[in-house]
Each structure stands twice: as structure tokens, then as C-alpha cells.
Amino acid sequence: MLQDPEAYWNAKHPQQDILYEGRPVPGRIKRVDWDIRRFIWHDDAILKTVLYQHVFLGTSNPMLGRSGDLVARDIQEFVVDHLKYVGDEKAQGVEEFWLFPTETYILKQGDCEDGAIMIASFLLNAGIAPWRVRVSAGWVKPSPTAPQGGHGYCCYCRETDNQWVVLDWCYNQDSHKDVSEKPLLKERDDYADVWFSFNHLYAWSHSGFAMAGRVKEKETDT
């Protein structure tokens, strides 16, 4: 086990400001730059109400008497059941449109990164430590012979061993598995190189990748 996992994981990759043309402003078509950290809402009354009323059924403090791993599994399962995958071009009429988490909840649909951002935001509002939560954007490869595609997904550093697992909702999702039984992210072949990752505090660049293009649509795994 790591001596200081929070310090280790926060320093594992270079921290830097990352701007992304995630969405246009109202009344415009052209997307504008956003600080990607601003898409994750860590302390929001609406999200806390959703957790209280619909995820943890009247429990105002989900972490009371429950492990973070169990909370994470319940949140992943809720998002998988609640959201329908709809690509940005079909839903918004534009190539890329990142939603804020309450928008995703109200619409009950979104692209891959929308659900990932909502999962991350729910985790933080439930009381999970920020260093255990991040959204990653990078390549995925469904099979050895399949082409790579861009994808956004939520990662969680589980309490079991302070290692990262994926809490996906629309690509190879495994919400039926306990977090302690999920395969480690570093051992998965279906998740490839990461371009960048972020939570509401920090953004990290990975593997010297220069981000290009967009987080592409991924079809819902059935």
C-alpha cells in the first residue's frame, strides 16, 4: 500500500491548466474555451437532493456507516439506470456540447463525458475525497482488432487498495460488480492512452499527449 496515496496520485502526472472547447455560450454556435475543472460540481444543493431522494433514499450522509467503495458502486448503478446515451450531434445539433451535471440529470441523457462528469460530481457531493475522483479523456479499444475511439469516463481510486478503477456508464459498464471486484484500470486493455484527466481542483496531462479533436461518441454497450 502507498504511504501517502493522496500526495502520490495528485503528483503522478503533471498538473496544468487545460482549456477545452466544450460547448458554446447561449445564442452562439461556435464553441468557446472552458476550464475543464468547472464542469465538475463538488458542492451542489440539487445534486445532494438527488442523492438524498433517489440514490440513498433518505440518507443525508451517505458515508455514515458505509464505505466509499459501496457509495461509488451505488452511484455508478444509479447513473447507468438513469441515463440514456445520446450523442451530441443528435441531442444538441453540434459536434461537441459538454453538459453540466444538473443539465444531464434533468435531460436524463447525454454523451459519454456527460455521464462521467455526473458520476464524478455525485461522488464528491456524497463525501468522497476529491483525490479519489477524476474524469479521464482518452482512447478506448473495444477489442484488439477494433479501431481506437475517443471516450470520457469517471475513474475512482478505491479504498480497497488505493488503486484506480473505472466507473463507466456507457462503455463496457460493470455496475453489477462490487468496486473491490472491478479490474484495475492499469490492467485493462479496453482503456488505452489517456489524454488528460481532471476533477474540480486539478487537471493533469498524461503521457505527453497533445489533445486534439474532441471526445468522440461511444455507442452504449449492450
Residue ranges, per PLM feature:
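A structural boundary/capping signal
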Residues: 1-222
